Amino acid sequence: MFQGASALTLDAKGRMSIPSRYRDALQTQAEGRVTITKHPDGCLLLFPRPEWEIFRDKVDKLPMNATWWKRIFLGNAMDVEMDGAGRVLVSPELRTAGGLEKEVTLLGMGRHFELWDAQTYAAKEQAAMAEGMPDALKDFTF
């Protein structure tokens, strides 16, 4: 399970260094292989390959009226491998789709990650906190 936020930097080639606390898990779980695709909220999703295959199969079974979502998730997916330095390459197309420049935030979201432009994530997080908790969390106990 992946959790926590990491402030990272994309290098000039679009490579991102995976935080060391996740590298061993990604090597063990996925042999360093990950899949990156678009997320409807304007960030990118980064899956260890076995988790991607589960997600991909769910998306593939969506009904015909969700064909555009299949295109968004599956048609934009790119398989990448961590290099010897623990970096993954985020393609130019996906960097553009996620609005990623240089400063990024990698969020561990359980079985996958979200990759955000750092400023965009900070603004969206601040807006969500200003709105207060949604009804779904009203009975949630901390």
Swiss-Prot record:
One of its GO terms (biological process) is negative regulation of DNA-templated transcription initiation. Keywords: Cytoplasm, DNA-binding, Repeat, Transcription, Transcription regulation. One of its GO terms (molecular function) is transcription cis-regulatory region binding. PROSITE patterns: SPOVT_ABRB. CDD domains: MraZ_C, MraZ_N. Transmembrane segments: none annotated. It is found in: Cytoplasm, Nucleoid. SUPFAM superfamilies: AbrB/MazE/MraZ-like. InterPro entries: MraZ, MraZ_C, MraZ_dom, MraZ_N, MraZ_sf, SpoVT-AbrB_dom, SpoVT-AbrB_sf. One of its GO terms (cellular component) is nucleoid. Residues 5-51, 77-120 form the SpoVT-AbrB domain. Forms oligomers. PANTHER family: TRANSCRIPTIONAL REGULATOR MRAZ. Belongs to the MraZ family. This is Transcriptional regulator MraZ. It comes from Paraburkholderia phytofirmans (strain DSM 17436 / LMG 22146 / PsJN) (Burkholderia phytofirmans). The gene is mraZ.
